[in-house]
Amino acid sequence: MKKEELKKKLSPLAYRVTQENGTEARFTNEFDDFFEKGLYVDIVSGEPLFTSLDKYQSGCGWPAFTQPIDKKVVKEKRDKSLFMERTEVRSSNADSHLGHVFTDGPLDKGGLRYCINSAALRFIPFDQLESEGYGDYIKYFS
């Protein structure tokens, strides 16, 4: 999708986050304190990224997940911006900036914390997976 089409499709915040590597404000975003059962997809492409089963309250101010739905749906890049070194997380299909992954997550779940911007995500409630075209993902919740 071309930049001009994306500017029309996305909110200004979602565009800034996904296309310009922005970061939304902590503790004031849509999914930080949201724990309904369902699927989180890339707001740009609709690619499934995370499930609510892997979401947890990390206290960081952004949605946190222990793992993506499949390692292939995200790619990681070294990020040396803001005078620090981090690992950026991007969606594989649309190359959307999602957030960062850190090694301070729950040890019993692998030790990773995927710290993701709400503005990069669209939530599909479990009871709407079939009607929204994500019926194949119901199996993840059984």
Curated annotation (Swiss-Prot):
Keywords in alphabetical order: Oxidoreductase
Reaction(s) this enzyme catalyzes, per UniProt: L-methionyl-[protein] + [thioredoxin]-disulfide + H2O = L-methionyl-(R)-S-oxide-[protein] + [thioredoxin]-dithiol
Example GO molecular function: peptide-methionine (R)-S-oxide reductase activity
GO cellular component, one term: cytoplasm
EC top class, as a word: oxidoreductase
Disulfide linkage: none
Annotated SUPFAM superfamilies: Mss4-like
The protein's Enzyme Commission number: 1.8.4.12
Active site per UniProt: C115 (nucleophile)
Residues in MsrB domain copies: 3-126
Xref: Pfam families: SelR
GO BP, sorted A to Z: protein repair; response to oxidative stress
Gene3D superfamilies reported for this sequence: Peptide methionine sulfoxide reductase
PANTHER family registered for this protein in UniProt: METHIONINE SULFOXIDE REDUCTASE, PEPTIDE METHIONINE SULFOXIDE REDUCTASE MSRA_MSRB
HAMAP family according to UniProt: MsrB (MF_01400)
Family affiliation: Belongs to the MsrB Met sulfoxide reductase family.
Protein name listed in UniProt: Peptide methionine sulfoxide reductase MsrB
Organism name: Lactococcus lactis subsp. cremoris (strain MG1363)
